[in-house]
């Protein structure tokens, strides 16, 4: 692979100040990343533009808080366009609505309207899913309901959360053909340990790309087939580990060396 991006949320512990952001962005570029998703640091369009201009790494996706997406849609569009980005996303749907089908569906309709406004202004709205979108109402996953009923919503498909949900990554790529402009690449592994009560535990864990169980060559072949434009490594847990930079560096090295 040639062009690979990183969701900066993965290194949020390294970008807390403007100077840290610039230094980390330069280091990530040297490691092989070509562009970024801006997330996980203070929202300042001027700061973001400075990074884009000085480091030469465009921002091709952002995650914006729910209240701003819903109540300041036009302002959010203006801010993103100021640093050259027209892909604007929701990081996660609200937990508080998951147990209320009516409220959840009303919420989805509001985001569909956000997507319509963005489309009219030359932007696209992207929904980043997790595993909880696979909660079912009357036998249908929430995610499938969104796909069928919200035509102005595009998707940032996430390999880890699909794997954890127990669904086929390939099948959802096909199902969303033409609506997946961005993807999050992160690997999946099972961690084994014995807890304090001496009970064996098996828990899912995010891993660097190529170091878990997902067949990324097959997955990326399908992503190319369905028209994915922007590939972002995302490792939510990297910022909590002592070797944060190494965690994301080995992902980009794997993708550049091993994926044809």
Can you say where each PLM-predicted feature lies in the sequence?
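Acidic/histidine-rich catalytic cores of soluble enzymes
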Residues: 120-213
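Acidic-and-aromatic substrate-binding clefts and catalytic sites of carbohydrate-active enzymes
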Residues: 13-18, 35-47, 64-73, 95-99, ...
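H/E-rich (His + Asp/Glu) clusters that bind or coordinate divalent metals
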Residues: 214-220, 226, 230-234
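C-terminal helical cap(s) of enzyme catalytic domains, especially alpha/beta-barrels
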Residues: 242-260
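Hydrophobic faces of well-ordered beta-strands that scaffold small-molecule active sites
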Residues: 2-8, 36-38, 59-64, 88-90, ...
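Aromatic/hydrophobic pocket-lining residues that form the small-molecule binding cavity
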Residues: 21, 45, 73, 104-107, ...
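Active-site acidic/histidine proton-transfer and metal-coordination neighborhood
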Residues: 26, 30, 54, 58, ...
């Amino acid at each position: 692979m040639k062009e690979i991006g990183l969701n900066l949320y993965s290194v949020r512990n390294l970008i807390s100040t403007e100077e840290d952001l610039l230094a980390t962005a330069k280091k990530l570029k040297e490691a092989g990343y070509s562009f970024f998703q801006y997330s996980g640091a203070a929202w300042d369009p001027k700061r973001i533009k400075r990074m884009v201009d000085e480091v030469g790494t465009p921002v091709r996706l952002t995650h914006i808080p729910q209240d701003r997406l819903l109540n300041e849609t036009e302002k959010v569009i203006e801010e993103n366009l100021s640093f050259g980005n027209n892909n604007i996303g929701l990081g996660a749907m609200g937990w508080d609505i998951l147990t209320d089908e009516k409220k959840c569906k009303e919420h989805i309709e509001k985001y569909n309207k956000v997507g319509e406004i963005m489309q009219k202004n030359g932007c696209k709205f992207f929904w980043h899913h997790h595993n909880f979108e696979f909660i079912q109402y009357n036998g249908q996953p929430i995610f499938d309901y969104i796909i069928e009923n919200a035509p102005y919503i595009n998707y940032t498909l996430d390999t880890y959360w699909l794997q954890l949900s127990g669904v086929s990554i390939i099948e959802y790529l096909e199902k969303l053909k033409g609506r997946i402009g961005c993807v999050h690449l992160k690997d999946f592994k099972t961690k084994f340990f014995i807890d304090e009560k001496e009970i064996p535990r098996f828990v899912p864990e995010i891993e660097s790309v190529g170091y878990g169980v997902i067949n990324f060559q097959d997955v990326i072949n399908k992503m190319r087939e369905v028209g994915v434009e922007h590939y972002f490594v995302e490792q939510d847990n990297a910022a909590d580990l002592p070797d944060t930079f190494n965690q994301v560096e080995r992902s980009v090295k794997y993708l550049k060396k091993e994926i044809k």
